[in-house]
Amino acid sequence: MSSSLWLQCLQQLQEELPATEFSMWVRPLQAELNDNTLTLFAPNRFVLDWVRDKYLNSITRLLQEYCGNDIPNLRFEVGSRPVSAPKPAPTRTPADVAAESSAPAQLQARKPVHKTWDDDPQAIAAINHRSNMNPKHKFDNFVEGKSNQLGLAAARQVSDNPGAAYNPLFLYGGTGLGKTHLLHAVGNAIVDNNPNAKVVYMHSERFVQDMVKALQNNAIEEFKRYYRSVDALLIDDIQFFANKERSQEEFFHTFNALLEGNQQIILTSDRYPKEISGVEDRLKSRFGWGLTVAIEPPELETRVAILMKKAEDHQIHLADEVAFFIAKRLRSNVRELEGALNRVIANANFTGRPITIDFVREALRDLLALQEKLVTIDNIQKTVAEYYKIKVADLLSKRRSRSVARPRQLAMALAKELTNHSLPEIGDAFGGRDHTTVLHACRKIEQLREESHDIKEDYSNLIRTLSS
């Protein structure tokens, strides 16, 4: 039997199909090539019908591509490939040898090599799963700052010692802050350290879709085996499990099985585990068994560093003052920064003009106008007052009770971070306070964000609300 032809088909199908779909339906097939007939053996009638219905055209196309006019007949059977003793090689005459040597090289290259499936275990192992990881996302090109420092350090430790350092590792924060980049970076580093590691990255919705498909097709055991056999499971946006009870039930058992096997789990969400609504308490409790780390919006210095790094990747010189101008005005997330820089670079390429502050102001005029319109001191005051269930008048008053003073300090710090107003202007907007009061408030909040988890959470939540 020849494994090389079917192996070629498998390798290409793995590239074309989702990882779980390939593992569930295509990988279990066994193949035998005899008398120009390729027979595919399925473990049961259900799998046979499913493969023939869903993948026949793809398999036929690949056979045509690899064999040309010599395409073998294709048939399907239920069962296992028969194991037979190797046949003795036929006696070859000088004419046979001459005929083979004179055959076109292309046909010789296409001719299958007859050997058993198990003769090439490394090749088979190579197609057993697909990680879905983005090779471009590495630790080397992740820009570190105070906002993501702890998350990056934890991710590095997990990649060096998966299943033992922090398990699970739970990263949370707003959209576009680098959580997905860190997931891929961990996965890529694990594989770099151990090329045989089975690491799978996916969005939580993909897990749900795979489970639903498995239930519909009576293949839940294959589904379980696949997900519980990985060395590291990286799931993005776990909050999409909300209100999906059957998916939560299955993930609960998968989670337990992986932890018992010291297999690494890394999850991300847009909010703290206990704040995820629609998810069972037993799952939320398990999310916090390892290490939970917040990824916050990047501070000004990190935003500047991100812009400089991205410009360098594009081989574009970006002056410090230009990077500062963009970073000062676009504060919500990394994705927004990258999008703005891409637009600036594209405009510069189209027009041939140098990238100056005036050029950036023109290229991003609609984006900058929208940002200034969305985030105002008035809007900040209303949002903070609503968040703490007090009145805007309280923020402007002379009251010094902690229930009012702390929200007032937070609002001042947010005004400094999210607007272009000067300290005196911010002080005037808060009941005519002196600029030194605003400066003290900003420094106090910066200190509390380091010391108090609650203040850190409140600040991140307000930033996310105001920037969305």
Curated annotation (Swiss-Prot):
Region (Domain I, interacts with DnaA modulators): 1-84
Keyword presence, Acyltransferase: no
One Gene Ontology MF term: lipid binding
KW DNA-binding (keyword) present: yes
Region described as Disordered: 80-106
Residue ranges of the region described as Domain IV, binds dsDNA: 349-468
Binding-site list for ATP: 176, 178-180
Any one Pfam family match given in the protein's UniProt record, by short name: Bac_DnaA_C
Keyword tags: ATP-binding, Cytoplasm, DNA replication, DNA-binding, Lipid-binding, Nucleotide-binding
SUPFAM superfamilies documented for this protein: P-loop containing nucleoside triphosphate hydrolases, TrpR-like
GO cellular component, one term: cytoplasm
HAMAP family: DnaA_bact (MF_00377)
Protein name in the entry: Chromosomal replication initiator protein DnaA
